[in-house]
Amino acid sequence: MTTKPESRLLSFADRGPVAKSYKKYFAKASLTFFAAMILGVFLLPLLYMVDTSLQHPDQRTVAGSPVYPAVARQGTYQGNTYPIYVVPMPDGSTKEMMLVEPGRVQSTFVDPNDASQTPVEWQGSWRTLSQAWSFNIDFDNFTTVWSQLNFPRMLFNTAAIAILSTIAAVISGCLVAYGFARFRFPGKNMMFVVLLATIILPFQVTLIPTYIIFTRIGWSGTWLPLIIPHLFANAFNVFLLRQYFLSIPRDLDEAAMIDGASPFRILRSVILPMSVPAITAVTLFHFFFSWNDFFLPLLYLQSKPELQTLPVAIQAYNQLYVSEPTLIQAAALMTMAVPVVVFFLAQGAFMRTVVITGVEK
């Protein structure tokens, strides 16, 4: 009795899961590729900054120099130093040779690996040849910026202003957000709407009035205009903290009140310990804003160079060394080092908080 051979073709029902798995894999691969492309676009300026800051200043002035940090190769012949070029050989290959006697029609080269050999006469203009380069990282740009820019002083100014203003912003934001989240008083909702409306208020609208006020009270030329205004809560910080405070059950407040805790004690012992992710996010947001702020320090500290921050100092440094991109990029890279380190140390709490909504947990 003969049996019918089993068909190797998958039925429609069998092909369904396979097709779905391939479709799911293709969707994930496409999403990953698209995300990598976007990431590359954002990382390209950073890669340019790192690459340029590690190059020797002379490399930027040589035509045909590589994009990576490198130094032009040189060799010694009879006690003198000569550049090395990539020379085409008669057999079609290329070889690195040391140019000892340049000429328009004929040039003399010597093998840099064996200078005792007879010099080679090459027919052609040496200017058409490519110079030989070797990978080389130059850290002198950072030491130059450190000394010329008075970097330690500018770093101290920037850190002091950023830390003090961040402390002021976090304290004021927590107090105001706690009032909107836990207390009942007439006009609370209207006041909160007005507070949120200040987010869309252009910065230029309040710039001139605040500048006139701070100048008349003698704050111009000091750090006070960069710190004191943050004692009056920022609307964005209040909104973010209030939404998080609302997600904390009121039962905890009532339990603390039964034990005799005051409203301030509830804030300090119940609300704040449970709101570490939100407070961390507000701290990072404001710290980065204050660290990168350029206009306000320029406006209020222009008469006091010793009190200026790094962004303002880098702008002045750029005007002096506009033809030295390696120094400018080194200064920018050194300036962004602190925010990058701070972000990576607190990225866990930060990423948990950026998705906060008004929905209770």
Predicted regions: what they are:
Residues 2, 14-15:
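Low-complexity, charge- and small-residue-enriched intrinsically disordered regions
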